[in-house]
Amino acid sequence: MQTHSSSLVFLALLCLSWALLVSPTRPPSQPPSHPPIQPSSQPPTQPPSQPPTQPPTQPPSHPPTQPPTPPPSQSPSQPSPLPPNIACKSTPYPKLCRTILSAVKSSPSDPYHYGKFTMKQCLKQARRLSKVINRFAQRVEADPGTSTVEEVSAVADCGELAELSVEYLETVTEELKAAELMTAALVDRVTSLLGGVVTNQQTCLDGLVDAKSGFATAIGTPLGNLTRLYSVSLGLVSHALNRNLKRYKGSKGKIFGGGNKPVREPLETLIKVLRKTCDKGKDCRKANRNLGELGETSGGSILVREAVTVGPYETDNFPTITEAVAAAPNHTFPEQGYFVIYARAGLYEEYVVISNKKRNIMLIGDGINKTIISGNHSFIDGWTTYNSSTFAVVGDRFVAVDVTFRNTAGPEKHQAVAVRNNADGSTFYRCSFEGYQDTLYVHSLRQFYRECDIYGTIDFIFGNAAAIFQNCNIYARKPMANQKNAVTAHGRTDPNQKTGISIINCTIGAAPDLAADPKSTMTFLGRPWKPYSRTVYIQSYISDVVQPVGWLEWNGTTGLDTISYGEYDNFGPGADTSKRVQWSGYSLLNLVQAMNFTVYNFTLGDTWLPQTDIPFYGGLLHTE
């Protein structure tokens, strides 16, 4: 690292408080970021005749959907105080947890109070970290010749992620003020946001390490300790809120409520109105009037605030999607309706970012391979994996329908993302994602994909979201010579994160280039990017493109006893599990375990998907 940053690094270490400087209980997890998969020198280990009996770690089940009951004004018997050593058992770092909670003057009876205390510490430290990173970024921008392009990009990512984490923690702090009356949906959102903070921190650190930044060396220990503070808070808050739900019998409720204004439309009706009214350069300003004239419609429907069009005609509102996004209002609520962007058929060579303040945006195209958003940023060309995306979305409740997203960098450019998604309650319907390595970055929070096509090679569905894929086609492409394909690479770093990749009723097959040369490479269902990686395949067709062992290790035996990989009721020539890996973190799921990874139970999608009017099923296709 050059001398210009040494003083700022020293400032960073001074600026961060005692909570960051507690000695770590173990070094931060820093596995490499998506290297090309090279052939193994040893053949895969053959499993025994019976699959392992240890099931994957399951997300907690949700309580019955009963009306919330207010807490009693006074409990019949006063619960005994809860000492820190007991409360800290719910966290992955009990020693650090006890050190932090030693500042609490008296032991409360409810672990929620411990969680609330640590949340204050988290928010305080997150704000300080954001300031430190922003100051460093300003120094780098002022004197760019002293830093590499990769370092500049990685530091910029850290600044963006740090600001996001502050916003998430502020939201959580506000929600926790009424923790006793929280519904399951709000609990799920709170724990998802806290899990997202942990993911943001890890993404920052990974990016700095990949960029070989001296800043990473200097700030690595404080970053690691702050990540542990976040993990401690996540464990305490998750345990406390789930305990309160059971205690007060809270209902599922709704995380994103609806309203009766401005206009409610079925999704397919909305699409037809847009395409008919705006066909061949007609004045699309009539679209909003037509929607208003249709008014309330029976059956499923969505709320529409305003509709704008993107295209080459003079009657279109905007020539680019980026300009249309910029025109959307900021910080809108669900009851205000969607800001609908209709992008005509065409090739849009632009890099679109939907920021955290742009919420309730619905992007509608003319269909797969008709409305195409394309870019070619890649890791080899100096972009971080996080920022190589052609299309990035952070704003809550984003919906995309009938759009193709591409990254055309090619396999020789390594990591090159088509879509990066860290938007809570986001949905992609009838879309396609085309790339090679790292095509679809399901970064964080809760996501749903329905009837989509995903193409790629190495780790082409990766990240640390709670992402569900229903009725999708997943195609492995032909990589470079001596590389192996992995469909998924989930990145859970904390056992309390309610994240994972759930693939239900999908087809896993070969793209045309690989189908023409099937013996050119080996394809696997996934590999563990991080220690608590979690992925399941349920009631899906698995073709013979998948190797009989099914799964691939990341780095030797690392994480194979802490991951959660499972399969349930799949079919097809590649679904035979008799030769699957014999890792302790892999198993064949039973019905009850598989149900934990459905829309109803894994993401509580039934509390936020109905407002999109996109079809979904909450459980399994069949249970026989």
Curated annotation (Swiss-Prot):
Pfam assignment, any one: PMEI
EC numbers for this chain: 3.1.1.11
Positions annotated to bind substrate: T385, Q415, R527, W529
Known catalytic reactions: [(1->4)-alpha-D-galacturonosyl methyl ester](n) + n H2O = [(1->4)-alpha-D-galacturonosyl](n) + n methanol + n H(+)
Alphabetically ordered keywords of this record: Aspartyl esterase, Cell wall, Cell wall biogenesis/degradation, Disulfide bond, Glycoprotein, Hydrolase, Secreted, Signal
Keyword field contains Secreted: yes
One GO term (biological process): pectin catabolic process
Sugar-modified residues: N225, N330, N369, N376, N387, N505, N555, N596, N601
Regions of compositional bias (Pro residues) in chain numbering: 25-84
Protein name: Probable pectinesterase/pectinesterase inhibitor 47
Provenance organism: Arabidopsis thaliana (Mouse-ear cress)
Organism ancestry: Eukaryota, Viridiplantae, Streptophyta, Embryophyta, Tracheophyta
